[in-house]
């Protein structure tokens, strides 16, 4: 089993780290707000730390799932100082492709592997361990990290070199935006036509209009 660290215990990161622990990996966690770390430790087997550097010390593989480019940069800069040589840094944050390329170069200079690996599937996918991962990086690094990521991901694809994972996530978001726009217009039409929305969804969700967004978002969209 791998010695891992997971940085960022939000709605996605907490269950992802939990699946790593459940799979038997040695998991160290860090979160900026310590209450989330304590809550995670009460529910899972693992160790909590008060700094990124301490959590990542001697790790074989470090995962981050944080807020934005700046957060990723700060986490990487701290982690690379204490990770063992030859270890891998996997960034699950939805961030920029430019940052991914920059960190891949820095990782290589530090003797580390790097993957930009944004995810899709939402909180439900994270909790079920069924996320989709689109990765950018070296094939050898992906091959080493993939079995560990299987703890929380059902579908993993190496898209191409560093930055490719983030670009693929952009494609994913563009497609989702189109689906959401169509779903919003359809729900608006059904409301104006005074149809029973639940019956409409029950019918069309079994046909060609079915989508993950319809299944998981229609009710909150109707409620506003």
Task: Show the residue positions of the predicted features.
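NAD(P)+-binding Rossmann beta1-loop-alpha1 motif at the extreme N-terminus of oxidoreductases
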Residues: 1-64, 87, 93, 123
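Helical "substrate-binding/catalytic lid" subdomain
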Residues: 164-224
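Hydrophobic beta-strand scaffold residues
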Residues: 27, 48, 113-115, 156, ...
């Amino acid at each position: 089993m791998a010695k891992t660290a997971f940085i960022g215990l939000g709605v996605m990161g907490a269950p992802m780290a939990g699946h790593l622990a459940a799979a038997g990996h040695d998991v160290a966690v860090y979160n900026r707000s310590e209450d989330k770390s304590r809550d995670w430790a009460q529910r899972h087997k693992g160790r909590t730390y008060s700094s990124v550097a301490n959590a990542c010390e001697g790790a074989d593989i470090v995962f981050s799932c944080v807020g934005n480019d700046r957060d990723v940069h700060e986490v990487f800069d701290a982690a690379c100082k204490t990770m063992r040589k030859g270890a891998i840094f996997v960034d699950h944050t939805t961030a920029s492709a430019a940052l991914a390329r920059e960190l891949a170069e820095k990782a290589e200079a530090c003797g580390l592997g790097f993957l930009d690996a944004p995810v899709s599937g939402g909180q439900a996918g994270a909790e079920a361990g069924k996320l989709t991962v689109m990765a950018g990086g070296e094939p050898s690094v992906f091959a080493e990290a993939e079995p560990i990521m299987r703890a929380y991901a059902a579908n993993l694809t190496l898209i191409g070199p560093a930055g490719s994972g983030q670009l693929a996530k952009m494609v994913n978001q563009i497609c989702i935006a189109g689906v959401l726009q169509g779903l919003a217009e359809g729900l608006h039409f059904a409301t104006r036509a005074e149809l029973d929305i639940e019956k409409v969804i029950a019918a069309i969700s079994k046909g060609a209009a079915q989508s993950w967004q319809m299944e998981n978002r229609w009710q909150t969209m109707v409620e506003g």
